[in-house]
Amino acid sequence: MVSVIEAHNTQWSELHRAQHPNILSLSQYLILPIDVRKREKSSARHNSSERGRQLSIAMQPLTRLIPRFAIDSGSASISRSLRISPRPSLKSSICLQCRIYSPSLRRHFADDQRPIIEPPPHLRPKVTPPEDPKPQPQPEEEKPASIPEYSKQDDSPSPQLERDRELPSTLESRRLAMTKKLSHLMDHMQGNIFIASQRINDLTGYSGIEALKNKITNLEAQVASSKELVRSTRLHYKTTVADRASSQREVTTLLARKDTWTPADLERFTHLYRMDHTNEQAVQEAATRLADAEREAEKAAGELSSSILSRYHEEQIWSDKIRRMSTWGTWGLMGVNVLLFLVFQFGFEPWRRRRLVAGFEEKVREALEQEKTLAMSTAIRGAEIGGGEGSEVSLDEIVAAEVQELKEEALVEGLGEPAVEAVAATIEGEVPHHESNNEPAQEIGEAAAAMDTAELNIPYSRPPPFDYRNIESWKEKMEAGKAAAIDLWSTRQVSITKKDITIIALEGAAGGAVLAGAIFTFIIRRS
């Protein structure tokens, strides 16, 4: 039947194929289900429903093709045998290939625009694939169109997830994770510390001493067990000796009255004689075990004594080595301190001093520029008004204010009146009355220099002697001590020579080294 169909397909004309481009040949319909099954096995899961639908569509013409072909063949053979030509009115105006397809099938391909079923690969013509038509709507449980929507939703960032990250529960879970991690680290910290201490012991040679300690502990247990064994063996030896002595006494008693023996006495003598032989062997074995136990105990005690002496010797050697290392470490620490002091004293301090001086000079320069600008503006305004004494009044006021401030400080600190007069005279003598208004900045600088010179030349007054009988003196002394203690932590600037700084730094380094060495030596001796 397949050969007949193939022969019939070869008779198709090119005009018939051009008129029916969407209709495949019958042989392709017969081969198509096999290829569809093969492609169903190798296709993805999401195309299985589509392939099944195409297979069902492809099988629909076959269900109508075979019966009609059989009926047509039978009618043709009957008409040829009876030589009855068909009526002209009943003859169809279309060809056999067009007649074998049902109207419903043509309506299915034409109206619904079903996707064209592709032929097998070996029969597929090399043409550009047409655009995919719109698929027929499927039931709700077989809709594959929802899968891309889910994928799009998965790919796009969800604002709900962003909001969930800021919820208290999410933050609490993160905090719990950090707490678990911290607890895990704390749990393993003890092991890490033990490993670090073991490495330090290996480097310093203390691991051998630890091994000696463990050996001494084992030997002590062995000596204790040996002593217990000697004690039990000696007790057993004494028991066997006492049993043999009692049996020998009874034998001696029986031998003393040998003439009056009865049969029972004879049996008793025989039993005692046999028992004496057994007791003699037991005494010999007990004596041997006692000697062996005493020998083992003495050996264990000797090993214990030698191990203790060896441990003491090794600890002395180790302590001497650690002491030497600590000495060299102390000297190294002192060298580092001295090096740091030299670096800070000759490298950092000059740089800091230059920086402070530069900043101070800049500020002084700015202050002088401002004062000069102010003096010039004052002179200009005085010239415009008609009085040229504005700048002189300003400079005199500045000098008077400085003198008054110096007097107040002298009164507070308890300076004598001659010192104040000397400072005032120095300032007043060094500050001349200027006649012109063109150099106010220079005059202010000279006045400041005169004030610095006067402050350096202030005589120091000796404090009055302390009165031990007056309570007020004690109160003043306590207040002064409290003020001095507070002043130690104040930000007051003081001037000191480099020699004093060097001495203080060296004293601090030496004191720290001595204290560290003493603490380390005390710890080593205690261990």
Swiss-Prot record:
Keyword DNA repair annotated: no
Name the UniProt record assigns to this protein: Sensitive to high expression protein 9 homolog, mitochondrial
UniProt feature, compositional bias: Pro residues: 117-128
Family listed: Belongs to the SHE9 family.
Keywords: Coiled coil, Membrane, Mitochondrion, Mitochondrion inner membrane, Transit peptide, Transmembrane, Transmembrane helix
Compositionally biased region (Basic and acidic residues): 129-144, 151-171
Oligomer status and interactors: Homooligomer.
Transmembrane segments: 328-348, 503-523
Top-level division of the source organism's lineage: Eukaryota
Positions of region (Disordered): 109-171
Role: Required for the maintenance of the structure of the mitochondrial inner membrane. Involved in mitochondrial morphology. Causes growth arrest when highly overexpressed.
Primary localisation category: mitochondrion
InterPro entries: MDM33_fungi
Spans within the Mitochondrial matrix topological domain: 524-527
GO biological process terms, semicolon-separated: inner mitochondrial membrane organization
Source species taxonomy: Eukaryota, Fungi, Dikarya, Ascomycota, Pezizomycotina
